[in-house]
Regions:
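N-terminal leader/presequence-like segments
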Residues: 6-11, 136-138, 531
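Conserved RecA-like ASCE ATPase "motif II neighborhood" in helicase/translocase motors
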Residues: 131-179, 184, 188-198, 477-484
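Conserved helicase motor core of SF1/SF2 NTP-dependent helicases
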Residues: 42, 47, 58-129, 179, ...
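A short, aliphatic-rich alpha-helical micro-motif
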Residues: 53-56, 174, 487
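Accessory nucleic-acid engagement/destabilization modules that flank
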Residues: 1-21
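Active-site cores that bind ATP or allylic diphosphates and position pyrophosphate for catalysis
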Residues: 439
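N-terminal pre-P-loop "Q-motif" helix
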Residues: 18-28, 33-58, 73
């Protein structure tokens, strides 16, 4: 969640220094371009998809089986809504990362439309912007900074994000939209739906919801009769899976039958004619594998597995995404992978180097007159003591500390790599090791502060920034939590199950289901010692290979 801030930039108030001429000039340069027909692609929609895309039913909820193309329909339906109304179209998600994904899907539609008429945001960012535009002052109670992150979120939720009265008081000045589409509706709280529909939709406007109750990983929406509780009656069901020839679809169905039979409706796929398969085994495409590893180092084992698959299965790095429910393991593996393979990665979270540099800058701000001795010695060690500022020094120290920690854990693999980077920074690995051994107390204190900063609001803002700038076709291996990758999909998924999954026990089945259904074709599940899920998963995966 992005916390509200009291920003005094009220759109309805003019400023003497910001003239109409200057505004027009800014608008001319910053306005999104026109999307042309030739910018799109020839997408082959099914008959059912075409019916929904061109439907003029003003209120609908769409739910569908795995791989039924819900987001593809949303994008095309949004463009059709613009063509009918020539008005403003609002597309909302829960996951901040889906903004780019939905933008790409809309870009694939063969139609001419102005991008400035499409607003794509997650709920919290949208409400933050609207409260700012309305000039609503955001206030916090005394000793707010002493509250836990959860307490802060509850405060903002009750006073702003779910506060209908706040919008009732400002109803006359709210800018409304001709059509509103909400993706991931299973993650929306009922008050959010009511606020969006009652205050931001023009009278008689189009209001369409998309979602899958089995991906209810945040537990924001209390299910009703095994389904999502929404403010639209009934639903349209999509039964055609466009991954029907892939093993991943069969695995998804078996997972539902094992884990969700008493909780949700099992997906009812349209049946495929199997008359030609009587004498022959079905030849499903894709690759499904499962590994259960005990008493092994998670990071080095994971690297070996992924590297071997890239070589033996000819997997392309751009097609690979590594998912887990927690960031800690992913962040450590990210550094291990980059410095072992000499390849870049694309992550939805901060790198170790980023956090090192961030903390170094924070320490400098708090100790402007005298840095801790070990940091001063590091600056001298890499011969950056005569620099105008510490920008380059802290960047290099951030890298060296990351590789140093890897070397402590995996000396055989990283000793030479550390030495190479030390030479690049005008020192040697021997000198670096000696310095950090002598200054162990100071460096240990630094590492303890790293653990604290990783739980703070600054890191949350950094992660949100990483998510906003995440794109699939980076040419590199992607790493993400399952939560952040929800809504996306990848050709090949490495899904990690850690031994413990604290704080997510209530929704871990949904989290796991969401993770495995992110795969378009290939799925490798790596279970690091979680015996309970090993007993549950092994059987259904063996029959899906």
């Amino acid at each position: 969640m992005i916390f509200l801030k009291s920003i005094k930039l009220k759109s309805n108030h003019t400023q003497a220094l910001f003239s109409d001429e200057l505004y027009t000039s800014f608008k001319r340069f910053l306005s999104p371009p026109l999307h042309l027909i030739e910018n799109g692609k020839n997408i082959q929609y099914s008959r059912r998809q075409i019916e929904i895309i061109h439907s003029q039913n003003r209120q609908q909820r769409i739910k569908g089986v795995v791989g039924s193309g819900k987001t593809t329909i949303l994008a095309a339906r949004a463009v059709e809504a613009y063509k009918r109304t020539k008005g403003k179209i609002l597309i909302l998600t829960y996951n901040i990362t889906l903004k780019n994904y939905i933008h790409d899907k809309i870009s694939q539609v063969r139609a001419e439309f102005p991008w400035e008429n499409f607003i794509i945001l997650n709920y919290h960012t949208f409400i933050n912007n609207e409260l700012n535009n309305l000039g609503v002052d955001v206030s916090v109670p005394e000793k707010f900074n002493e509250l836990s992150l959860e307490q802060k979120e509850k405060y903002f939720e009750s006073n702003y994000y779910s506060n209908k009265q706040l919008f009732t008081d400002n109803a006359e000045t709210i800018v409304q939209y001709d059509a509103i589409f909400i993706d991931e509706i299973q993650d929306y709280k009922r008050p959010w739906m009511e606020i969006i529909k009652e205050f931001f939709l023009v009278e008689g406007g189009e209001y369409v919801l998309f979602g899958d109750v089995k991906q209810n990983i945040y537990n924001n929406n209390q299910t009703e009769f095994k389904d999502v509780n929404t403010n639209v009656k009934g639903f349209i069901r999509l039964k055609d899976c466009f991954r029907s020839n892939y093993k991943i679809k069969d695995l998804a169905v078996k997972f539902q039958e094992l884990f969700f039979k008493d909780k949700y409706e099992i997906d009812d796929f349209n049946k495929i004619d199997t008359s030609l398969e009587i004498q022959f085994e079905r030849n499903l495409e894709g690759y499904v594998n499962y590994m259960y590893l005990q008493n092994t180092d998670n990071v080095s084992s994971l690297y070996t597995i992924i590297h071997d698959n890239i070589i033996n299965k000819n997997f392309i790095p751009n097609d690979i995404t590594i998912l887990s429910h927690s960031i800690a393991l992913l962040k450590k593996f990210d550094a291990y992978y980059r410095y072992s393979s000499n390849e870049k990665t694309n992550t939805m979270f901060e790198t170790s180097e980023m956090v090192n540099t961030m903390l170094l800058n924070k320490i400098k701000t708090l100790n402007s007159n005298s840095l801790p001795s070990w940091i001063n010695k590091m600056i001298h060690l890499i011969k950056r003591n005569n620099d105008y500022d510490t920008t380059k020094a802290f960047a290099e120290i951030g890298i060296l500390l990351t590789i140093y920690d890897l070397t402590l854990a995996y000396p055989i693999r990283f000793d030479e790599i550390l030495n190479w980077y030390c030479k690049k920074c005008n020192t040697s690995s021997i000198n670096l090791k000696n310095l950090l051994t002598i200054e162990k107390e100071g460096y240990d204190k630094f590492k303890n502060e790293l653990n604290l900063i990783s739980k703070g609001e600054t890191i949350k803002n950094l992660r949100n920034n990483k998510k906003l700038h995440f794109y699939m076709n980076s040419g590199t291996v992607k790493l993400s939590t399952i939560h952040s990758f929800k809504g996306w999909e990848s050709e090949t998924i490495f899904l990690i199950i850690e031994k413990k999954h604290t704080n997510v026990e209530a929704t871990f089945d949904e989290i796991l289901y969401t993770g495995l259904t992110r795969s378009r074709k290939n799925l490798i599940i790596i279970n690091f010692g979680n015996e309970a899920y090993n007993l549950k998963l092994r059987g259904i995966i063996e029959t899906s290979k």
